[in-house]
Regions:
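Predominant activation on well-ordered alpha-helical scaffold segments within soluble catalytic domains
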Residues: 7-14, 41, 45, 63, ...
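N-terminal small/polar loop signature for handling phosphorylated ligands or for N-terminal nucleophile
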Residues: 8-11, 15, 19-86, 168-213
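Conserved active-site and cofactor/substrate-binding residues in soluble primary-metabolism enzymes
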Residues: 4-8, 20, 31, 35, ...
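Short, acidic/small-residue loops that bind anionic groups at enzyme active sites
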Residues: 90, 94-110, 214-231, 271-274
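Gly/Ser/Thr-enriched, mixed-charge loops and adjacent short helices
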Residues: 2-11, 83-193, 237-240
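Short glycine-rich phosphate-binding loop at a beta-alpha junction
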Residues: 21-29, 152-158, 247-253
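Phosphate-binding and adjacent anionic-ligand microenvironments
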Residues: 201-202, 211, 222-413
Length: 413
């Protein structure tokens, strides 16, 4: 991403707004992200839209800023360790939908519409202090007395801005916070007063408690969702930001079947979303069931710390059913992906077409979805409470997809 490209993205993004309007821009804090931030600000102002520069903050804090300050949208410049990227938000602080992104992309290719008068330019200002407001919101959503009277240690590995938000919130409660820079993920925790958490660049969370108990992202989502379900309609982090969504929880379609059943036993209806956190946030807002602890990594970690103190986390982790998964991938031509997925769906019953195809099979389940990577076209993930059955189920669907791929080759030969 070059500054010129960032300027054009900012202009294309702002050209969609009805004037008068304002949009916010924030960077994750690295030097290159700051350069791109000011380029995007210039692009927004070039279209007559007022541009607000926000100090370095986490993506969740910036999303909260856009939502609470009347902005028509926002741009977050994120340096994920590989390449800088621009994440575009709507007026609700939710990542733009694919339809809106196509509109921005068309504007980017067309080029910015330059004004004829200086008076038509937007004003660039500063919008600060919202990160502190976001931290206060996290503090207001937990049982402070419980946290203050039961001080613990959090060992955390996370993107810089997310780690700072979480650290400041917990330090106010008297907790010890240790930053972890381990490249190989979590290590076991043998101190009963310590919890270790890892947040990756996609917002997925894993945690370690009490010896070799390590929970992956699906397990973390399940224990949080179960806690929300038990306290539905009240309690810390139990209420959605918009009233009326107390009976619904939006979870990824990849959530294993036993975990789904565990949550539904609490009397909550589950709505299934695509895998990405952005899609989960978008659907939860649309269904009026936005729970910060499920869709914001910072809120999730604070919630997990509260559950750790109350004993809920250990109880829920021990009660989780044991799940085994097996994963494989196959390659095929890009033009055949849609055809193969459609043919597979037509030959199966009771499939869920969300983010690919999900099927229930006896005591197991299988997800088949486009991989979206250069070295694989399809990703097949099978699961069961029996490890051998999970492997067998995965092999069965790899074979089915292979036959579909080869049958098309035979027709063309």
């Amino acid at each position: 991403m070059t500054p010129e490209a960032a300027l054009r993205v900012g202009a294309a993004f702002a050209s969609r707004f009805a004037l008068p309007a304002k949009a916010a821009v924030c960077a994750s804090g690295e030097p290159i992200s700051v350069v791109l931030k000011y380029a995007a600000l210039a692009g927004i102002a070039s279209q007559g839209v007022d541009a607000e520069a926000v100090n370095a903050a986490s993506m969740s804090a910036f999303s909260y800023t856009v939502r609470k300050t009347g902005c028509a949208g926002g741009i977050y410049v994120n340096n994920n360790g590989r390449n800088a990227e621009l994440v575009l938000f709507d007026e609700n602080g939710i990542e733009l939908s694919p339809d809106a992104m196509r509109s921005v992309r068309a504007g980017f290719l067309f080029g910015e519409q330059k004004p004829t008068l200086d008076a038509e330019l937007g004003i660039i200002g500063n919008l600060n202090g919202l990160e502190e407001a976001y931290e206060q919101r996290l503090l207001c959503g937990i049982r402070r007395e419980l946290m203050l009277n039961n001080k613990r240690t959090l060992r955390i590995g996370a993107p810089e801005q997310s780690g700072r938000v979480i650290s400041r919130v917990l330090l106010r409660l008297g907790w010890n916070v240790e930053r972890s820079y381990a490249e190989n993920g979590l290590s076991p925790v043998f101190d009963e007063n310590t919890i270790a958490v890892q947040i990756d660049n996609d917002g997925k969370i894993s945690l370690s408690i009490s010896g070799d108990t390590i929970l992956g992202n699906s397990e973390v989502q399940t224990v949080i969702a179960r806690s929300l379900a038990v306290n539905c309609g009240g309690g810390a982090f139990g209420l959605p930001e918009k009233e009326g969504g107390a009976e619904l929880l939006v979870v990824p379609v990849s959530l294993p079947e036993p975990y789904r059943d565990d949550i539904k036993k609490q009397g909550v209806q589950l709505i299934y979303s695509k895998e990405s956190l952005a899609e989960q946030r978008r659907l939860s807002f649309a269904r009026n069931a936005y729970y910060p602890a499920l869709y914001e990594p910072e809120a999730a970690v604070v919630k997990l710390c509260e559950m750790f103190v109350s004993g809920e986390l250990k109880d829920y982790a021990e009660a989780l059913p044991k799940v085994y998964t097996s994963e494989k991938s196959i390659r095929t031509a890009w033009k055949d992906i849609g055809r193969m997925l459609r043919m597979l769906a037509e030959g199966e019953k009771n499939g869920e077409l969300v983010d690919g195809l999900r099927l229930k099979r006896d005591t197991g389940w299988v997800c088949v979805r486009p991989a979206g990577t250069a070295d694989a076209s399809f990703r097949i993930v099978a699961g069961s409470r029996d490890s051998e059955y999970a492997k067998e189920l995965c092999d069965v669907y790899v074979e089915k997809l292979t036959r579909l791929r080869d049958s098309e080759k035979d027709k063309n030969s």
